[in-house]
Amino acid sequence: MLDRIKGCFTESIQTQIAAAEALPDAISRAAMTLVQSLLNGNKILCCGNGTSAANAQHFAASMINRFETERPSLPAIALNADNVVLTAIANDRLHDEVYAKQVRALGHAGDVLLAISTRGNSRDIVKAVEAAVTRDMTIVALTGYDGGELAGLLGQQDVEIRIPSHRSARVQELHMLTVNCLCDLIDNTLFPHQDD
């Protein structure tokens, strides 16, 4: 059992090292995409399922409340946080549309959709991205594995941050770290002296 525990930590560390080498450019581009949208008076919509939903809610909460230091609130909405809306849509047998309907209702040109999917194949996330494209929104996608169907939907202005792993637990761990990096970069770009 102890060896298995050490193996989990070792694998996580190795994935973090690989990500630290592979992802800084994509994370930087994503952060600047989010910052520019906010500076233009737009908002960030985010969504995910399961652990990815928790990461989406963590991001939105960090924007609306704060990340590590006090600063003005920033507009972000976790589309997976409203159980009444989700279950109303799903109750009409539109499970794949639970996020897309919200994107079509709330999203505007210049907004960003932060779409989080471990494998990139969740139908409701894919449909949300398709809806965001029709609303002239930019997409920041957090994926893993081979990026899945989601990776193929992204345009030139969009950003994919693909965790270099084929293990769901490692991908999800690194998604949380990536969300924290994005929050830190947004705060330090928009409010550079807040932590002094």
UniProtKB/Swiss-Prot annotation:
For this UniProt record, give its keywords in alphabetical order, as a comma-separated list: DNA replication
Give each disulfide bond as a residue pair. Answer: none
Domain SIS, first and last residues per copy: 34-196
GO molecular-function annotation terms? carbohydrate derivative binding
- SUPFAM superfamilies hit by this protein: SIS domain (SSF53697)
Protein family (similarity comment): Belongs to the SIS family. DiaA subfamily.
Outline what the protein does.
Required for the timely initiation of chromosomal replication via direct interactions with the DnaA initiator protein.
For this protein, the record's HAMAP family field holds: SIS_DiaA (MF_01157)
Q: What is this protein called?
A: DnaA initiator-associating protein DiaA
Originating gene? diaA
